[in-house]
Regions:
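Residue(s) in the substrate-gating loop at a strand-loop-helix junction
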Residues: 145
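Conserved glycine-rich Rossmann-like NAD(P)H-binding loop of the short-chain dehydrogenase/reductase
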Residues: 31-48
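Active-site helix of classical SDR
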Residues: 125, 161
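SDR active-site lid
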Residues: 174-219
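The beta1-alpha1 cofactor-binding region of Rossmann-like NAD(H)/NADP(H)-dependent oxidoreductases
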Residues: 42-43, 64-75, 107
Length: 219
């Protein structure tokens, strides 16, 4: 009998290949969750899957996906249904960040950032929130940012996308509560965190953030 036939709960984590997503996956596996790992890099996902299987003896499903692509959210949802995976906890962590003057940055890259940070998150939430509400239980955690609370020059599209995530999540949480759906919806707003997103000299270094202000994923 496979592990997915047990009473273990299952979490789906996007952006799971490194940083906050990988840390969430590790913590959840340690709490005896089976984990569905979603990100672009299949090799990194397989490495994480092997690690979690060895450490915690949980079942990991690897789903490589580029969430900036049209219909990526629907394809992800359909795969979970085809595999009979019941998602109890959804963590929308996948995100992109590009720094620089708005008019200097490539428009296609900014549109891709919106596709991942806003459109994919909205679509994935819609698909899984519906099925969770039908079951009468489930949890959704959307990763926003402290950037959601302010206008940030050189990060205007990123900050705006995270403001959307925060506002959307707060409103959806109220809807789910008012409808007695049994589904909890929460936004997490971390500060600047030492991940690969911030390691890129064109990203984190440009912000001139003192090392003492950086958070670490385990925090």
């Amino acid at each position: 009998m496979g592990k997915y036939m047990t009473n273990r709960k299952t979490a789906l984590v996007t952006g799971a290949s490194d940083g906050i997503g990988a840390e969430f996956s590790d913590i959840l596996a340690g709490l005896d969750y089976n984990v569905i790992l979603v990100a672009r890099r299949e090799d990194k996902l397989n490495e994480l899957s092997d690690k979690l299987n060895n450490l915690y003896d949980v079942d990991c499903t690897v789903i490589p996906a580029d969430l900036s692509e049209p219909q990526a959210a629907q394809k992800l949802f359909d795969l979970t249904q085809d595999k009979n995976l019941e998602v109890d906890l959804l963590i929308n962590n996948a995100g992109l960040l590009h720094n620089g003057y708005f008019t200097d940055l490539d428009l296609a890259e900014q549109e891709r950032m919106i596709a991942v940070n806003v459109l994919a998150l909205t679509s994935i939430t819609h698909l899984f929130a519906n099925i969770m509400a039908t079951r009468g239980k489930g949890c959704i955690l959307n990763i926003s940012s402290l950037a959601a609370w302010m206008a940030i020059p050189n990060q205007n599209v990123y900050a705006a996308s995270k403001a959307y995530v925060l506002s959307f999540t707060q409103a959806l949480a109220d809807e789910m509560l008012a409808n007695s759906s049994g589904v909890s919806v929460t936004a997490l707003c971390p500060g600047y965190t030492a991940t690969k997103m911030m390691d890129n000299p064109a990203q984190g270094a440009q912000l001139r953030i003192p090392p003492t202000m950086m958070m670490f994923v385990r925090e």
